[in-house]
Amino acid sequence: RNKDMGRESPADFTFYGGIYRDVTLHIVPAEHFALPANGAPALKVTPIVTDLAAKTAEVTVEAAVVGAQSVTFALEGQALTAPVENGTATAVFTLDHAHLWDGIDDPFLYTVSAKLDNGEEASARFGCRKFEIDPQKGFFLNGRSYPLRGVSRHQDRKDAGIALTNEMMGEDMALILEIGANTIRLAHYQHAQHFYDLCDEKGLVIWAEIPYITMHMTNGRANTLTQMEELIRQNYNHPCIAVWGLSNEITAASAVNEDLLENHRLLNELAHKLDPTRKTTMANVFMLETTSPILEIPDVNSYNLYFGWYLGELEQNDEFFDKYHADYPDRCIGFSEYGADANPQYQSSHPEKGDYTESYQCIYHEHIAKMIADRPWLWATHVWNMFDFAADGRDEGGKHGENQKGLVTFDRKLKKDPFYLYKAYWSKEPFVHLCGSRYVDRAENVTEIKVYSNLPEVSLYKDGQLVETKQGDKVFTFQLPITGKHSIEARSGEHSSVILVNKVDAPNPDYAMDNRKNVTNWFDGELDESCWSVKDNMAAAMADPKAGPILKQISDKAAAARGDVAAAVKDNPALVAMMERAMQRMTIESMLMQAGASEEDIKQLNRVLQGISKE
């Protein structure tokens, strides 16, 4: 591992190699538009909306030139000729009644062209728009409230790795647009130019960031600065980009020391020097204390929280943001990552944290989606992740080498049920979706039927007969007796969705991980209350001189299954403190189930704990 390369820091996704994007050869005459070594385009366009009410914009165009004496620029019927001074020609246009780039509603793009006397030409697309972020009101686009609600995306795919074709990128964009998202966090590195182009064309507001991840490397400063310069210079003209990301979870495996702080100060200063028109941000790991000085460096802040999945309870997400907002009313705060892994093969009538069921992923996102909707002051929120992605350090949830937090599977063939939850919240396209299409065999006599829809009323039918009509908001649940094979249909107006269910005598073992197939009750007999058991509070048991070391050994083993990042962060003092706070609320059983422990492992631990008296 090269300690001078920021991209080589540990991270919870697969690092691919090779040349996986287009390579072009440029043959140019003596007089030509420059090809900068940092990969920047020849034209740099800076549109500033100077009067939002009148829609007046000032557009500055700079051309990098070699050998020529002048450049003629053209924009919307206006032509300006400018001399070349020190390799650059500059023209300033005024657009009256400019057609604004207005997000997904109207992503209008202008094209400016430049021409040399020898006929050489260059052009660039751009958009006129105004971004504002208010700590009390959230994100604004062109003067109107425009809460950024969307997803994060890694640019890999099953059987293609990171070498996505333009067609594949178009398919990704279509899926993101289907749920009605208006923002994408492009994690955790620079993405293909074609995808930025798609975001310009479709109106998605973008968070773009460099691969400065998890662990600060003392010798990596120069590389992080180079990465930031290349990111900004190459993507400066894209109207979709609203913020530059300085780092991701950089304190997960690093202490907040002066070297780390100085690295971020320099990145922040560089970003503003290269681009005074955009804000800076960073995604902070959940255990970073809100009093940390690193939060004072970027213009706006954001946190990655996983309460209700990796640790703690769902309600802690609400509590965290409400407290932060109350404690720091002058700071802008966003929700840069949240999610729960789900293998769509796994289904349950009683889903729980750590079971990797699609059923629990629904419960998780139902809570978070409502929490977000109730807090418009969250300037941006991004589901982690739109798609399952490769994470070679992981071995969990029935799959090796995948992070399964996506709303869509790694091969893009299956939309998990929470995909439709966000469609219900964000999309204007009317629809009805019945959840649980993969939960066919059901052992319960009365089963829960869940419907996601953005329509106000849904009717449920069993075998063609009306069961019940409900009014609701996004999520509709019905309790339905079942006796055999049934066709279940949800209808709202002309929209409908159908699934099949089959009453069985016992749970289908294929719906649970191998280590949980026969779980009904962990224990056959009574527990001795004078001794420790997995039903006891985790923090209390950890404090016991005999039970504590046993539990620590097990928790370390569970962390290792989460991959390279989990192994790196386990000794982080801030994480230890966060885990201790979480343990105040949780039983040993709950912690183990969340970590994916098997039935036999939990039973065996309980036998051991039942042999240790409480002192």
Task: Describe the role of every protein-language-model region.
Residues 30-38, 118-119, 369-370, 389, ...:
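Short amphipathic alpha-helical segments with coiled-coil-like heptad repeat character
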Residues 24, 423, 427, 606-614:
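A short, amphipathic alpha-helical segment
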Residues 1-186, 203-206, 227, 237-243, ...:
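Secreted/periplasmic carbohydrate-active enzymes, especially glycoside hydrolases
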Residues 11-18, 29-31, 41, 99, ...:
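Flexible, active-site-adjacent loop/turn segments at secondary-structure boundaries
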Residues 21, 108, 366, 379, ...:
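Short alpha-helical basic/polar micro-motif
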Residues 29-55, 396-399, 413, 556-580:
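Intrinsically disordered, low-complexity coil segments
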Residues 522-614:
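Compact, charge-rich alpha-helical regulatory domains located at protein termini
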Residues 60, 173-176, 183-414, 418-425, ...:
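Substrate-binding/catalytic cleft of secreted carbohydrate-active enzymes
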